[in-house]
């Protein structure tokens, strides 16, 4: 789901890069209340786990592959702000060391996967917890619902970005 370099024009990538920087700054500020000396190692381990599971790709269709996102899991484990930071670190490492995504698209990917996907999963998770029966399985079920919902929501953000500044030849209706 990483957007590669050259798929979205530079003005659009720059605008969403600025939004990603702003969102990351908010996450940094808010993470101070979510993470302390006791929970900081969990945030780091969560980032490592997300990185590891994202290295496992599975075929989707016609020469493409997918992998787990991890934002919803991180959100449940360490809170939304720390999760956003963990996913941002993972995306940065993947872009810099593995060319997964790309540097000019890093802001787009951070916006979609670290901010939109995590925020969406947080809102869906909180809503699901409120409406599900209060049982042992409510939290894992709410987390699964949140993870499931976060993927099309972040994909919709990409579709909006593609509609604004897509360089590809595919029409937006095909992308969405």
Where are these regions (language model features)?
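Conserved active-site and cofactor/substrate-binding residues in soluble primary-metabolism enzymes
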Residues: 39-43, 47, 68-69, 115, ...
């Amino acid at each position: 789901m990483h957007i590669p370099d050259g798929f979205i024009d530079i003005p659009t990538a720059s605008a969403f890069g600025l939004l990603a920087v702003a969102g990351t700054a908010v996450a940094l500020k808010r993470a101070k209340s979510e993470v302390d000396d006791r929970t900081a190692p969990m945030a780091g381990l969560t980032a490592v786990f997300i990185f590891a599971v994202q290295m496992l790709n599975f075929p989707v269709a016609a020469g493409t592959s997918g992998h787990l996102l991890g934002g919803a899991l991180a959100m449940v484990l360490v809170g939304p702000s720390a999760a956003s930071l963990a996913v941002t670190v993972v995306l940065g490492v993947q872009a810099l060391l593995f060319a997964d995504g790309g540097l000019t698209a890093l802001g787009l990917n951070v916006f979609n996967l670290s901010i939109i996907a995590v925020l969406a999963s947080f809102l869906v998770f909180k809503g699901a917890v409120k409406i599900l029966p209060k049982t042992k399985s409510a939290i894992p079920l709410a987390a699964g619902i949140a993870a499931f919902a976060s993927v099309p929501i972040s994909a919709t953000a990409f579709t909006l970005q593609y509609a604004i500044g897509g360089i590809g030849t595919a029409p937006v209706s095909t992308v969405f």
